[in-house]
Amino acid sequence: MTDLTAQEPAWQTRDHLDDPVIGELRNRFGPDAFTVQATRTGVPVVWIKREQLLEVGDFLKKLPKPYVMLFDLHGMDERLRTHREGLPAADFSVFYHLISIDRNRDIMLKVALAENDLHVPTFTKLFPNANWYERETWDLFGITFDGHPNLRRIMMPQTWKGHPLRKDYPARATEFSPFELTKAKQDLEMEALTFKPEEWGMKRGTENEDFMFLNLGPNHPSAHGAFRIVLQLDGEEIVDCVPDIGYHHRGAEKMGERQSWHSYIPYTDRIEYLGGCVNEMPYVLAVEKLAGITVPDRVNVIRVMLSELFRINSHLLYISTFIQDVGAMTPVFFAFTDRQKIYDLVEAITGFRMHPAWFRIGGVAHDLPRGWDRLLREFLDWMPKRLASYEKAALQNTILKGRSQGVAAYGAKEALEWGTTGAGLRATGIDFDVRKARPYSGYENFDFEIPVGGGVSDCYTRVMLKVEELRQSLRILEQCLNNMPEGPFKADHPLTTPPPKERTLQHIETLITHFLQVSWGPVMPANESFQMIEATKGINSYYLTSDGSTMSYRTRIRTPSYAHLQQIPAAIRGSLVSDLIVYLGSIDFVMSDVDR
């Protein structure tokens, strides 16, 4: 893979004209076929004509060292954006983020659209996982994807009026009329939830027998949240299924347009509510790219330490609940004892437990307290023995292996087609962990390994990779404990928010800055930035657009759970209902991460 650690600082504005893919595109389509946008995303951003979209996408997919994964796809309302110098005229735009694993490089394609012609060809013919992303973009922006197999709402109820991420759509409850749920409206909403197989291209039966359609969820305990799957069954065999999401949708991306850069940090904790500080990492790193902030080494190590603590915390819950889904109850109670020790440590450091909101733009909220090292030492002495007991008592159990090995299995090709990341991707033999492939927050300075599977990702392999990931996280924590740098816990930068307290008590200028940044929020330079990280469940990323304001113009959150749930039908067809329960337990998802 290409060494990304030797590049310029992440916050440099670059057009990436030196990236080989730009030359390959120009050789194929001509030197004037595209507009290349300079950003702080760290990714080549290329505006293309709508008519070229499918041809360019197909070209990139067939290159030597191809762009094999559609990582993200979404839209933007450009109508109120003032800083668009050098960009094609657009009322709306759609972007396509592609990844080449072999190159360890990305490219972002953008298509400009006029308000009176919001049509673009579907990308599902090239990448099947474009399905949900296009549905969501239509749902929230009203952009139509011609040729889409079933373009319907996915986040909002089917009866919803309007497209919430448009700039002319209200962002506050006080801008709406008071909500009333009449009997007639309740009946309408219930009718809208009725599943009609024909709408999904499903048959109600064959010549000899009828299929049964079964609702699993949205309140089934094995659905792991407000999640509904409609199963088309031939006896116990799953002929097909339709995942139904959106019940946990909170409008997190819309909130990003009404909160200051600083005050949005608590919202990031709640995107994937088990990840804690892991969720804060991509957001603050993306904002720091916009601001041009380089944080001290101590900040990097503290952030890594908190992230790995939350990774262990999340993995323990995942492993124990998976074992519970298969039928063994005891490990989940042991795991909560271990997780309690992590929460005690996190609370001692941050003051909070599940949702610390502790990372800051330019640093962390405060320095490590006295005694943090003793608490971490006690945990590191405790956890390895417990992990070994889980493996011996439950994960090596013959019954558990028989229930999970070979279930919901897929290979590398399928994983890449569906945008699978994290342990699900690495189980197929693809060695791609962002902490190693594209180090951030100083991960390149840590000695740890990436567990990789043998070529097939099944339920058992995914779980066992997470067990090994726990051990690697313990290795990282040991290094944090032994090599914590001295130095400040905030960067000395005008946009560090809030600025160091001692400065505000001595200088009127910094006191004014503190007042403005806390009351109105810091003003970030107009630009775009992007940051992906290896979160607890796969790759999580924030793509931020600043228009030179105290708030984000567009906050795009790409979560791993969303992509993983879209893959369910492809992985489970032909299996039994009982296998689906095991598969759901092996995915590692929470619905807040899916629905945002």
Curated annotation (Swiss-Prot):
NDH-1 is composed of 13 different subunits. Subunits NuoB, CD, E, F, and G constitute the peripheral sector of the complex. Its main location: membrane. It catalyses: a quinone + NADH + 5 H(+)(in) = a quinol + NAD(+) + 4 H(+)(out). NDH-1 shuttles electrons from NADH, via FMN and iron-sulfur (Fe-S) centers, to quinones in the respiratory chain. The immediate electron acceptor for the enzyme in this species is believed to be ubiquinone. Couples the redox reaction to proton translocation (for every two electrons transferred, four hydrogen ions are translocated across the cytoplasmic membrane), and thus conserves the redox energy in a proton gradient. The keyword NAD applies. Residues 210-596 are annotated as: NADH dehydrogenase I subunit D. Residues 1-186 are annotated as: NADH dehydrogenase I subunit C. The lineage of its organism: Bacteria, Pseudomonadati, Pseudomonadota, Gammaproteobacteria, Enterobacterales. Pfam families: Complex1_30kDa, Complex1_49kDa. In the N-terminal section; belongs to the complex I 30 kDa subunit family. Its EC number is 7.1.1.-. It is a peripheral membrane protein. The keyword Plastid does not apply. GO terms for molecular function: NAD binding; NADH dehydrogenase (ubiquinone) activity; NADH:ubiquinone reductase (non-electrogenic) activity; quinone binding. This is NADH-quinone oxidoreductase subunit C/D. It is found in: Cell inner membrane.
